[in-house]
Regions:
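FAD-binding subdomain of flavoenzyme oxidoreductases
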Residues: 1-10
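Alpha-helical interface subdomain recognition
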Residues: 10-16, 20, 27-29, 35-179
Length: 179
């Protein structure tokens, strides 16, 4: 569907032996090592969500300044202007959360739930921004020749990989009320 530049495939390791001196991190500790890296991975995703949203908004403003309907640039209509204001506000709110989380990470103090909140908020925001931007492109936004169409499709996976939005909510809820 999206991310056409990414090559995804399955790997199968049947009847394979790894010498004990070649095991990284210790036998049976791979899952724990993976879990330790998830907050950083989710933070990186959140940074990407904010950056992608910034880009989509920029493209959309540029396009709607040029595209005319009823003799006026689409950007001049109140609906478009309010959409720009809403999206910019949401992007900046998420940027603040990402920056706070980056600072915590740099101090070695980024919790699993903080990273989950950051990833949840920014990936959901990216989906909303992609949808509104595509709408402002009109019919052209639906055509794959336009980068907003590709960005819309690519935004969808942000709410899936690194832990789905539902998993992020569970991580956050557990930090509040336990299992």
């Amino acid at each position: 569907m999206g991310l056409h530049s990414g090559d995804t495939s399955e790997l199968f390791f049947n009847d394979m032996r790894v010498p004990s001196d070649a095991v990284l991190g210790g036998l049976g500790k791979g899952f724990a090592a993976l879990m330790d890296e998830l907050p950083r991975e989710r933070l990186i995703m959140a940074v990407g969500c904010v950056a992608a949203s910034d880009g989509m908004l920029d493209w959309t403003i540029e396009y709607t300044m040029e595209r005319r309907t009823f003799g006026e640039p689409v950007a001049k209509y109140q609906n478009s202007r309010f959409a720009f204001a809403d999206m910019k506000t949401e992007i900046e709110l998420n940027r603040a959360l990402v920056e706070k989380s980056v600072n915590r990470y740099m101090k070695g103090d980024l919790s699993t739930e903080d990273a989950a909140m950051c990833k949840l908020a920014s990936s959901e925001m990216q989906g909303r921004v992609a949808d509104r931007c595509l709408q402002l492109f009109g019919g052209y936004g639906y055509m794959s020749e336009y980068k907003i169409s590709r960005a819309y499709v690519d935004a969808r996976v942000q709410r899936i990989y690194g832990g789905t939005s539902e998993v992020m909510k569970e991580v956050i809820a557990r930090s509040l009320v336990g299992r």
